[in-house]
Design a protein with these regions (language model features):
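Canonical P-loop GTPase G-domain recognition
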Residues: 1-34, 38-43
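C-terminal effector/interaction modules appended to NTPase cores
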Residues: 45-222
Length: 222
């Protein structure tokens, strides 16, 4: 039943493994609906000829951005319009994920690394309390007394572990709520609080803005 149907299983009328793999529906991994552009760098040339240029560089996390789109800068909430979009030095009209682009706006808005450009009627959630499933890769066990760094997109904030909800047994998928000792390669569900708000989406809808890296500041391990 891998490539051809087996005569040793007359009771099985389903498809072969190969047929299933060829026909199974795989949803796209690109979210083209929710416009999210985390700002990585603000470009301000020092040359006199370009002194008035202010560009916001980064990689599009999701959604489609077009010249003329009305946007909102987060977390400030200031509104503007996309004036130009560049890939390198080439000007384009439309940008898709995961393109790395530079955007200019019609208004001189104060944006910096870690901020986000989105749509006014479709914004990410601003939260400090996170409920997440993690895979711990550090040599030292997860320690609730340690102030870990959350790297989310282009922003980094300090955080504290509020609760280890359970550890997942990878052999049985049993959720062990009594075992809160999280060591290397363990998978666990945790609650944590960040020092400042993060702009997030549900992971099932947006893998980029719905995920983060938890870093041990003493070793830089995750």
């Amino acid at each position: 039943n891998v490539v051809d149907a087996s005569t040793n299983m007359p009771w099985y009328n389903g498809s072969t493994l190969l047929q299933h793999l060829e026909e199974v529906h795989v949803s796209g991994d690109r979210n083209l609906q929710d416009c999210r552009f985390p700002v990585q760098y603000v470009i301000r040339p020092q040359l006199d000829a370009s002194r008035d240029f202010r560009g916001y560089a980064g990689r599009i996390a999701s959604g489609v951005f077009k010249v003329g789109d009305e946007i909102v800068a987060l977390p400030s909430g200031m509104k503007s319009t996309v004036s130009k979009i560049f890939v390198g030095e080439q000007s384009i009209d439309v940008a898709y994920p995961p393109q790395s682009v530079t955007m200019t706006l019609t208004d001189d808005i104060d944006l910096s690394r870690g901020d986000m450009i989105a749509r006014e009627n479709n914004q990410p959630d601003s939260v400090q309390e996170l409920d997440a499933q993690i895979c711990w890769m550090g040599e030292q066990p997860l320690n609730s007394a340690t102030r870990y760094i959350v790297r989310h997109g282009t922003s980094e904030v300090k955080s504290m572990i509020r609760e280890v909800m359970y550890k997942l047994d990878i052999n049985t998928l049993h959720r062990d709520e009594s075992d809160t000792n999280i060591g290397m390669n363990d998978i666990a569900r945790i609650k944590l609080r960040t020092a400042s708000p993060l702009l997030v989406d549900d992971y099932r809808r947006n893998r980029t803005t719905g995920s983060f890296v938890l870093i041990d500041p003493s070793s830089n391990l995750t």
